[in-house]
Amino acid sequence: MANSHFKHTSVLLDEAVNGLNIRENGIYIDGTFGRGGHSRLILSQLGTEGRLIAIDRDPQAIEVAKAITDPRFSIVHGPFSKLAHYTEKAGLIGKIDGVLLDLGVSSPQLDDPERGFSFMRDGPLDMRMDPTRGQSAAEWLMNATADDIAWVLKTFGEERFAKRIARAIVACNQEEPITRTKALADLIAQASPIKEKHKHPATKSFQAIRIYINSELEEIEQALEGALQVLAPQGRLSVISFHSLEDRIVKRFIRQNSRGPQVPAGLPLTEEQLKARGGRSLKSIGKMKPSEEEVADNPRARSSVLRFAEKVSE
């Protein structure tokens, strides 16, 4: 069952949907349904022939989505990395007018102790966005080497004490398995020789483990490639990211596809290369950050960045 009592406020709600430039009878994909904030706003702007396909890999989000009885709406349970696959099954490749992606973990996932995402609330050390698939954080930490753990903490959390924390985790697991979020958070705090002001010592490590367990960065890369594949000419891409690792991927993807294929300079070009030289797939529309008012109302919005792009006519 969905835990509807955990509130979720969609960040940059109006801005992200406005960036899609909704067409009354268009077909849209909300790749991260969550609790449906973006989906409901998109539906409110669609006409009778419009259509919205939502995707989420969290079973709790799927339960919320099932309550929407609008015939223009459909929900798919799965990762957004497969959005091109879902679109192909529906016979809609190249016909999608807009794709919206709201990256990272949602407030209900963070706020529900049973999901195991938060170091602020004690719960089982899980961290899976889809608890029915893959290994939990506790299972991975139990079987991983100190080198593997340190690499994850450094790569996905930019944790300066990654090796020290990793050794402490392995040593603790050899004595007694770490199965609770509070136990892991306390262990990380003890292993961190320097504490940052106004920041829990476990912040970066929890982010890193969560990203690794859910393959979040690979998911984003595949979702962006899929979005480019399914969009119609003039179709819009609207992406909200919440930390630099996510935003770096989105920014690089839009930039690379706005430039077109790179060909060697100063060499005779084939006919195919000449065609490719001027070709580009996306046009960057720009980016936005939340207003001071939104950040004051929802502090989790502080680090968010919204980027827009448009599919170039073929």
Curated annotation (Swiss-Prot):
EC id: 2.1.1.199
Q: Which GO terms describe its biological process?
A: rRNA base methylation
Composition skew (Basic and acidic residues), residue ranges: 289-300
Q: Give the record's GO CC terms.
A: cytoplasm
Binding of S-adenosyl-L-methionine, residues: G36, G37, H38, D56, F80, D102, Q109
Which reactions is this enzyme annotated as catalysing? cytidine(1402) in 16S rRNA + S-adenosyl-L-methionine = N(4)-methylcytidine(1402) in 16S rRNA + S-adenosyl-L-homocysteine + H(+)
Q: Which GO terms describe its molecular function?
A: rRNA (cytosine-N4-)-methyltransferase activity
Top-level taxon of the source organism: Bacteria
- Classification via InterPro entries: RsmH, SAM-dep_MeTrfase_MraW_recog, SAM-dependent_MTases_sf
Q: Where is this region: Disordered?
A: 278-300
The alphabetized UniProt keywords are: Cytoplasm, Methyltransferase, rRNA processing, S-adenosyl-L-methionine, Transferase
Where it sits in the cell: the answer is: Cytoplasm
Show the coiled coil region(s). none
- Family from the record: Belongs to the methyltransferase superfamily. RsmH family.
NCBIfam families named among the record's database cross-references = 16S rRNA (cytosine(1402)-N(4))-methyltransferase RsmH
What does this protein's UniProt record list under function?
Specifically methylates the N4 position of cytidine in position 1402 (C1402) of 16S rRNA.
What's the protein name? Ribosomal RNA small subunit methyltransferase H
Question: What organism is the protein native to?
Answer: Photorhabdus laumondii subsp. laumondii (strain DSM 15139 / CIP 105565 / TT01)
